[in-house]
């Protein structure tokens, strides 16, 4: 089979003039990250490729045990990884500065870069992007992986980025997965998760939420941003600067002030007594309403950045009627909760239905409890058999201590995986004897247990909670 004018057809081998040099050429970057892609139905492979883009960068990700080899190429092309231009020594790694960045200074053995004057120089200063907010509210963080005084070789990796570990794409965690049902808790793609994952923070991520406060010119007068707010609790005002804006580094919880703001009251809102006192005492404070920006209900985080824009600033264009605009960026830790969406790389997605205590999870003969329980009915009709092959090879990989490379359209056969399982003292069918964690009784049938890379997608339950007081 060959392609002629983009159409596949059967031709004589002597007429073939060109040859694809890589199996990855057939698919895009996302699809080339799916191991055993050739064993997945096309619709599920498409879902898997799309969901790779929706994954949350985890606080401590781990590279997949079963990988395709394209992970490092994708990470290198992301633009977040910085590499040494030549052999040299790290002079310093500066902490995060006021602008939210940090720097790595390298002293190369030979002149490798040009300085500000255009002369060749041995010293190279690299600026890093730390704790920036992406359009999906996730964290963009170029983490230094070198330290001061360390020797580096040419092309050695100096930084990791979001979803990158040791210069390789790491979008999830390698978890022990069992394919079995558990009292209906994994009915219709629901997922049962062990409390161990929540306790260790294996699937924890950080969201950076942006809260905006605008002072406008109204009919009744100008709104003012100030720390001098009447009838407000002193403990809430303590975190504000003299300008009325929360300090960077402050830990804020629900209802706490981010920006203090007063808005002029309409005439009809004042009682006759207030009007009289206002006339006699000429009190402006009582003529203002407290419209401060507060932390929303149920949220808790740390203020990492504050941006202030004013009409007086040169080169700043604000909307008509806006006098001042304050943006407060708060880093919020998102722990794994019921309702979060998890997915593998084969379009096998689901929602966490319950987080069971570690001791209640099914366990193996050696006492190891499983981390995740998936429904076996999610495999036959979806025809994404790649997840089963990943489970088995991941299980063999865990016991051998080696990672398994499975390039797209060039992966190993089921017989090879079975041989690898046998070589590591495991059953050829990939099944294990499993005991019920609640009763200690052995399950009637043996269960497929393996290791799969599981991602947390950017559809978090905490961000989707809505409430209505009426209607």
Write out the residue ranges for each language-model feature:
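Structural and coupling elements of P-loop NTPases
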Residues: 169, 184, 197-202, 346-349, ...
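Conserved actuator
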Residues: 268, 344-351
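Long, charge-dense accessory insertions within large macromolecular proteins
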Residues: 1-147, 153-336, 340, 417, ...
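A short beta-strand motif that forms part of the nucleic acid-binding face
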Residues: 108-112, 183, 195, 264, ...
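Conserved nucleotide-binding/hydrolysis micro-motifs of P-loop NTPases
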Residues: 183-185, 310, 335, 348-349, ...
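Flexible glycine/proline-rich, aromatic-decorated loop/lid segments
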Residues: 119-132, 352-371
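Long C-terminal interaction/binding lobes of large macromolecular proteins
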Residues: 282, 389-471
């Amino acid at each position: 089979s060959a392609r002629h004018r983009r159409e596949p057809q059967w031709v004589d081998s002597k007429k073939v003039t060109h040859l694809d040099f890589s199996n990855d050429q057939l698919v895009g970057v996302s699809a080339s990250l799916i191991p055993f892609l050739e064993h997945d139905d096309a619709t599920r492979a498409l879902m898997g490729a799309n969901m790779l883009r929706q994954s949350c960068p985890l606080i401590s990700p781990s590279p997949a045990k079963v990988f395709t080899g394209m992970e490092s190429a994708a990470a290198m092309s992301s633009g977040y990884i910085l590499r040494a231009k030549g052999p040299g020594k790290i002079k310093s790694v500066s902490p995060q500065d006021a602008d939210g960045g940090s720097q790595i200074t390298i002293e190369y053995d030979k002149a490798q870069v040009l300085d500000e004057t255009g002369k060749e120089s041995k010293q190279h200063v690299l600026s890093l992007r730390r704790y920036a907010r992406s359009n999906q509210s996730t964290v963009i963080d170029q983490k230094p992986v070198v330290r001061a005084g360390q020797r580096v070789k040419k092309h050695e990796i100096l930084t990791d980025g979001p979803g990158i570990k040791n210069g390789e794409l790491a979008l999830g965690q390698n978890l022990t997965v069992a394919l079995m049902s558990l009292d209906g808790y994994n009915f219709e793609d629901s997922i049962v998760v062990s409390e161990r994952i929540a306790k260790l923070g294996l699937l924890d991520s950080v969201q950076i939420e942006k809260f905006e406060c605008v002072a406008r010119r109204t009919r009744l007068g100008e709104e003012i941003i100030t720390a001098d707010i009447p009838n407000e609790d002193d403990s809430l005002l303590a975190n504000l600067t003299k300008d009325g804006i929360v300090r960077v580094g402050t830990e804020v919880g629900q209802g706490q002030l981010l920006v203090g703001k007063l808005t002029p009251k309409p005439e009809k809102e004042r009682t006759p007594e207030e009007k009289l006192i206002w006339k006699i005492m000429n009190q402006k404070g009582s003529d203002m309403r407290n419209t401060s920006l507060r932390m929303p209900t149920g949220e808790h985080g740390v203020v990492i950045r504050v941006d202030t824009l004013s009409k007086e600033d040169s080169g700043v264009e604000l909307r008509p009627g806006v006098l001042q605009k304050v943006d407060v960026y708060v880093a919020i830790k998102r722990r794994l909760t019921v309702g979060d969406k998890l997915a593998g790389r084969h379009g096998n997605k689901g929602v966490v239905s319950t987080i069971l205590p570690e001791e209640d999870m099914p366990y193996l003969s050696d006492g190891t409890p499983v981390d995740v329980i998936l429904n076996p009915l999610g495999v036959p009709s979806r025809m994404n058999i790649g997840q089963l092959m990943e489970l088995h090879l991941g299980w063999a990989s865990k016991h051998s201590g080696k990672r398994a490379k499975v390039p797209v359209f060039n992966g190993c056969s089921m017989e090879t995986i079975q041989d690898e399982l046998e070589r590591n003292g495991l059953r050829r069918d990939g099944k294990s004897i499993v005991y019920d964690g609640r009763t200690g009784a052995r399950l009637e049938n043996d269960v497929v247990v393996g290791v799969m890379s599981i991602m947390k997608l950017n559809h978090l339950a905490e961000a989707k909670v809505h409430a209505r007081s009426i209607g």
